[in-house]
């Protein structure tokens, strides 16, 4: 799994050199932000069911046609799968907060997702809406410290951009 530390070391190793000062500063910055990332990961873990449910509801509110017969959210099974996928993305964001990099999102959430959704005839816009809702819902200091919210939002933006 990729983290800032493994990415920096791998890049330096591939170039046949020791990590540079700027490489080490990047690692140091990541370590300094670790407390904020862990705060965000803990809050998300404690509230993931509520956040996922609200995000799912926001997506369906914006795209009500998905509940029509034959659409991607027309049966209870499809609804459960959509809600599951949203929660899965949030869980991957939580894992990414813990490791301090996008590795979990890249490896388990983004790789091949467009092709899978396209082959199944599933629109990605509702997922984008759900993650956007989760991003816009967060508030500092009500929910998280400013730095924790910044770390959380950065990963949500990353996931949103990958689905867009």
Curated annotation (Swiss-Prot):
Superkingdom field: Bacteria
Keyword Membrane in record: yes
Keyword DNA repair annotated: no
Membrane topology summary: Peripheral membrane protein
Keywords on record: Antenna complex, Bile pigment, Chromophore, Electron transport, Membrane, Photosynthesis, Phycobilisome, Thylakoid, Transport
Any one of the GO BP annotations: photosynthesis
Principal cellular location given in the protein's record: membrane
Binding site for (2R,3E)-phycoerythrobilin 2: 139
GO cellular component labels: phycobilisome; plasma membrane-derived thylakoid membrane
Post-translational modification, as annotated: Contains two covalently linked bilin chromophores.
Gene3D superfamilies in the record: Phycocyanins (1.10.490.20)
Family, per entry: Belongs to the phycobiliprotein family.
Complexes and interactors: Heterodimer of an alpha and a beta chain.
Function description: Light-harvesting photosynthetic bile pigment-protein from the phycobiliprotein complex.
Protein name stated in the entry: C-phycoerythrin alpha chain
Protein source organism: Pseudanabaena tenuis (strain PCC 7409)
Gene name of the encoded protein: cpeA
């Amino acid at each position: 799994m990729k983290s800032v530390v493994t990415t920096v070391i791998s890049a330096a190793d591939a170039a046949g050199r020791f990590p540079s000062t700027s490489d080490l500063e990047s690692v140091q910055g990541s370590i300094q932000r670790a407390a904020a990332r862990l705060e965000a990961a803990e809050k998300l873990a404690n509230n993931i069911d509520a956040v996922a449910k609200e995000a799912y509801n926001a997506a369906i509110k914006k795209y009500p046609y998905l509940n029509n017969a034959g659409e991607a959210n027309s049966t209870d099974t499809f609804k459960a799968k959509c809600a599951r996928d949203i929660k899965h993305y949030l869980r991957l964001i939580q894992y990414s907060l813990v490791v301090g990099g996008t590795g979990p999102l890249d490896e388990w959430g983004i790789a091949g997702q467009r092709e899978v959704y396209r082959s199944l005839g599933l629109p990605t816009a509702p997922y984008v809406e759900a993650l956007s809702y989760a991003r816009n819902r967060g508030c500092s200091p009500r929910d998280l410290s400013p730095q924790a919210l910044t770390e959380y939002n950065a990963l949500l933006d990353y996931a949103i951009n990958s689905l867009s």
